[in-house]
């Protein structure tokens, strides 16, 4: 479905007030035809070259679903996930992020056993690729992953770099995320 609201509970999967409903083949034709300007996808693992693995980890094959079709034709790709996994607990409030329990699993690894998305191919195609986590934002450049933004309350060395298997390039224009993202209040969008 395009637009509308997804229902919850026992009616999960149904939508209300949709603008359009397409069958799967039409949706994939849209992807293959370059209909996406930007896509938002998750990641299981990311390496120092910006490669992403979503289909095989922890000894299990999960499959790629439509991941390859979507990422192969989008002009901008935004990967979203947590920096670590397996027990990660965070708190937000007063305009900052606090990590109360670190995850046991490193998701930003030196190299990947399986590559679902190629950072090299993305760079060759001139794509804008971002990796957004709860505490840091990275962008892919020719020389690797650049740390471009951190959450308020996060220590770069303790909470970001030490939780990665490689050291990202710290951008010279490193920014702090807007504190309003870390408050339990209306953000005031207009």
What are the functions of these language-model segments?
Residues 1-3:
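Glycine-rich phosphate/diphosphate-binding loop of Rossmann-like nucleotide-binding domains
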Residues 5-186:
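Conserved phosphate- and dinucleotide-binding cores of soluble alpha/beta proteins
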Residues 188-190:
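Short, low-order "capping/linker" segments at domain edges
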């Amino acid at each position: 479905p395009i637009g509308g609201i997804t229902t919850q509970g026992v009616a999960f999967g149904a939508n209300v007030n949709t603008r359009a409903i397409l069958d799967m083949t039409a949706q994939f034709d849209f992807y293959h035809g370059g209909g996406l300007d930007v896509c938002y996808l998750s990641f299981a693992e990311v390496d120092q070259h910006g490669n992403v693995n979503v289909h095989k980890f922890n000894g299990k094959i999960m499959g790629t679903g439509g991941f390859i079709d979507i990422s192969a034709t989008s002009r901008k790709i935004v990967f979203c996930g947590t920096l670590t996994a397996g027990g990660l607990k965070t708190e937000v409030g007063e305009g900052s992020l606090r990590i109360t329990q670190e995850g046991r699993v490193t998701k930003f690894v030196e190299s990947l056993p399986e590559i679902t998305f190629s950072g090299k191919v993305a760079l060759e195609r001139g794509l804008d690729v971002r990796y957004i986590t709860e505490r840091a934002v990275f962008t892919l450049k020719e020389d690797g992953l650049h740390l471009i933004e951190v959450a308020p309350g996060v220590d770069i060395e303790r909470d970001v770099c030490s939780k990665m298997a490689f050291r990202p390039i710290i951008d010279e224009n490193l920014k702090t995320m807007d504190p309003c993202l870390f408050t339990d209040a209306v953000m005031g969008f207009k």
